[in-house]
Amino acid sequence: MNTLKPLIAAAVSLCCVNVYAADSASNAELEARIAKLEGNNAPSQFKNSQVSLYGSIRPTLSYLDDSQDDTWDVRDALSRVGIKASTEFADGWSAIAQGEWSVDIANSGNFGKARQAYAAIASPYGQVGIGKQRPAQYTLVAEYVDIFNHGNSPYAYDHDSPFFVDNFLTYQLVTGNLTWMAGAQFDGDKGDDATDMVNLGVGYDIDNLHIGIGYITQNTADQQGVEGDDKTLGGVVAYTFSNDLYLAVSYQDKQYNYDAGSMNKDRSGSTLDTALAYPIFDDYKIKLGYFQFKDGIKDNTSADYNGFNTTLEWNPVDNVRVHLEYLDKSYDNRDNDHAVTIGFRYDFSLTWHG
C-alpha cells in the first residue's frame, strides 16, 4: 500500500506535465499562426510604400450677365478626386503612379475626364514619367498666378495654353535652387510621326522668390489641314513679402506660324496674368487680378479680351474655403461678361504607409 501511493502521485504528476507541455505547444503553434496571418495582411509589395487618396470639391453659384442675358447657374471650379502611390525599391529610387479625375458638379455629378494618369520612376538622377501629366509651362510658370477660385484661372493663360498634356514623356531634376523640366508629346494619331509638342522649362526658388521660364513648340494644322507650328516663350516672377503680401506676374509671347498654302497668316499674340493676395484678418484674404489675352488677329474675328477680378476669401480651417468673387471680362469684338460668384471648397487627403 505504501508503494502504491507514490506510484499514483507520480502518474498524476506525469499527466499534468504532459498536459502543460501540450498546452504550451498549442499556444506556440497558435501564436505562430497569428503572426503568419498578420504578415499576410501586409503583402511584400506594399512594404516601403505610400498610398494617398485625395480630392477637392468646389461647387459655385454664379450670377452671369453677358450684356444681353442674365442667369443664375450652379457651376464647378475644377473639382477632382485622385489617388497617388509610391514604392521605394532601392535607396533613393521609387516607383510612382497617379490617377486624377474631374468631378462634374455643374451637371450630374459624374466623374469627368482624366486630369492626370501616369507612372514614373524617381531617382537621384531625376524623375521620368509617361502618361497624362502637368507640363513645365504650367508647373513652373502659370501655377504661380493660378490662385483664384475659378475654372478659367489663370484667365489669359486659359484661352490657349496647356494645363495637362496626354501621351506625354517627362523628365524633372532638382539641383539646388533650380528645377529643370522637359517634356515631349508623342501622339501617333495626329500631328507629326515624331513629337507633336516639346516643352522645356526651368524654375529658380530662393526664400520667398520664384522665377520660372518655359518654352513650347507645338505642331498645328489649319482647317484645310495645312500644317504649322506654334511657339510660346513665357515667364513668371512671384514673391511673398514679409507682411504676407503675395504678388505674381506672368507673361507669354506666342508666335503662330503656318506652312505655305495656308489661308491663315502668321501672327503674334501674348498673354498677361497678374495675381495679388493679402490677408486682411486672421481667416480672411483679399485677392486681385488683372489679365489680358491677344491672339494677333487684326480683324473682327479676333478673340482679344482683358479684365479683372476681385475675391474675398474666408478660410476657417486649412482645408475649407468660402469665397465671393466679382469677374469682369471685356472683349474687343463680342459682348462683355460680368459675373458674381459665391463658392465653397473642401479639400481632403488620406495617406496610408506600408
Give the positions of each predicted feature.
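Flexible, surface-exposed loop regions and adjacent strand-edge segments
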Residues: 146-150, 267, 305, 340-343
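Extracellular/periplasm-exposed beta-strand and loop segments of Gram-negative cell-envelope proteins
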Residues: 73, 156-160, 256
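Detector for outer-membrane/organellar transmembrane beta-barrel domains
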Residues: 197-302, 307, 352-354
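Solvent-exposed adhesion/ligand-recognition segments of exported proteins
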Residues: 132, 140-175, 179, 185
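Solvent-exposed loop/turn segments connecting transmembrane beta-strands
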Residues: 105-111, 160-166, 186-196, 224-229, ...
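Transmembrane beta-strands of outer-membrane beta-barrel pores
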Residues: 59-65, 101-105, 134-136, 175-177, ...
